[in-house]
A protein has these predicted regions:
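Short loop/turn motifs that initiate or flank beta-strands
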Residues: 4-180
Length: 180
């Protein structure tokens, strides 16, 4: 539509459409914590210098809670805010990236019992495991304990070996081998 005024100038109308923006994210690696939440940092592509537009309201989750490398992280609920945000349109409301969940370290504690000489090095130990997250199923197995030699004596070194087992074993690693 054209309109002329008395100065011989012409006016018309047209639209200014919102500029498209794309959000991309980088996820942080984490140690297993029994949940799938992820921490991410986002970046907008396409904002004109001097405009104030930022990403907001995003939540990020790993594909599941378990340990693995290059796990998919989905970022959803993306929106933009800021004084210039009405001039822009976010093209993606969901973004994906990858990150790692590494095993949580466990510490096994052992206490050796005294014994009477019996011509062998085998030892009896009591044990506990620290660091298992409530609700996960982990136990120590294949516990082997041996005195450094079979001779009678005080303050003898006992070497203990063991490994972990249970439904959640793939999310943990035993971080110590023990000499008592």
């Amino acid at each position: 539509m054209c309109i002329r005024d008395r100065n011989n100038s012409t006016t018309t109308t047209a639209n200014i459409s919102q500029k498209s923006l794309t959000a991309s994210y980088t996820a942080e690696n984490k140690v297993y914590d029994r949940n799938n939440t992820a921490t991410v940092a986002g970046e907008l592509s396409g904002v004109i210098s001097g405009d104030q537009v930022s990403l907001s309201n995003a939540s990020a989750v790993f594909s599941n809670k378990n340990v693995a490398n290059n796990k998919t992280v989905t970022v959803s609920g993306l929106s933009i805010s800021g004084t210039s945000s009405s001039n822009y349109a976010l093209q993606n409301s969901i973004a994906t990236t990858t990150a790692n969940i590494s095993p949580k370290s466990l510490i096994a504690s052992f206490e050796a019992s005294n014994k009477v000489y019996d011509r062998n090095t085998s030892a009896v130990v009591t044990h506990s495991i620290n660091g298992v997250i409530d609700g996960d199923i982990i136990s120590l197995e294949n516990i082997t304990a041996n005195f450094s030699d079979k001779r009678a004596g005080n303050n003898k070194t006992v070497t203990v070996t063991s490994n972990i087992s249970g439904a959640d074993v793939s999310n943990y690693q035993l971080s110590n081998t023990t000499e008592l």
